[in-house]
Amino acid sequence: MMIPIELRQVQITLNAPIGTLTEARRQRILTELEGAFTPQAVPFQGAFALVNHASREALFLTDAQLQYTAEGEVHFSPSRTEDLLGRVRDVLLLDDRFPFIMQVIGHKDANGSAFERTVDAFTPLPPITMRQYFPGLRGLGLRITFEQAPYVCDLRIEPLFSDPAYFYIQFNAGSQQTMLSLARIVEDAGDWINRLQGEMNSIIEEMLGG
C-alpha cells in the first residue's frame, strides 16, 4: 500500500504589474475579502501581507507580484483559490494573464530512517563506499528537473532533517515564459498536486525500493 504524501504548504505566485499599493488600494482589497484576512506587518517596504489565521492562508503583494500560501494540513481547493485571487485581481484591475510559479511541500512517512533509505536508494556508488568517502554521512537528496510545456518542473526528495522518520518532498512548476489565465493556473495547480500525490508518489516509492 502506497504511503501518502501529506501536503504541508502550497504556494502560488503570480507575476503582475501591480504598481504602488496605496492605502486606498489596500483598503479596497480588505473590503473585497470581507474581513476574512487581517493585515500583517512585514519588513519589506511597499509590500502588503494579509493572513487568515483560521484557514492558515496568507496573501503577499508587492508592486510586481501576488502570492498565495496555504500551510498546515493543506487541502488545496482550486475553486476557493481562484475566487480569492480573482477578487484581488479584479480590485487591482489586472489583466487575467499571468506568468506563474507554484511550490508544493509535503512530508512522507519513511517507514524507517529517511537518512538510511536515501543513502541506500540514491547513491551512485555502493553505500559502504559512499560512507567511506563521506565519514559521518547522514543522508542523500535527489533532484529531478523536467519540462512539460508550458512548465519547467523540479522535484526534490530528501530526508526531513527535523524528523528523519519522514522524507521531505518539494515540487516546483513554473510557466515563466507563458501567460496563463487564473482559471487555468488553479486548474493546473490542482492537477500537479494530484499527480504529485498519485503517479509521482508511486515513482518515488519505486526509487526508494518500495
Could you tell me what each predicted segment is?
Residues 1-72:
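N-terminal low-complexity, intrinsically disordered segments
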Residues 17-18, 70-76, 108, 173-188:
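A generic structural motif
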Residues 29, 77-88, 186-196:
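Well-ordered, non-membrane alpha-helical segments in soluble/globular domains
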Residues 32, 84-87, 118, 203:
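Charge-rich, solvent-exposed alpha-helical interaction surfaces
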Residues 51-74, 78, 82, 154-175:
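Amphipathic N-proximal alpha-helical interface segments
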Residues 68-108:
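Aromatic- and glycine-enriched beta-alpha-beta binding-site module
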Residues 107-172:
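Aromatic/basic-lined ligand-recognition segments
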Residues 147-210:
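Mixed-charge, glycine-accented linear interaction segment located at domain edges/termini
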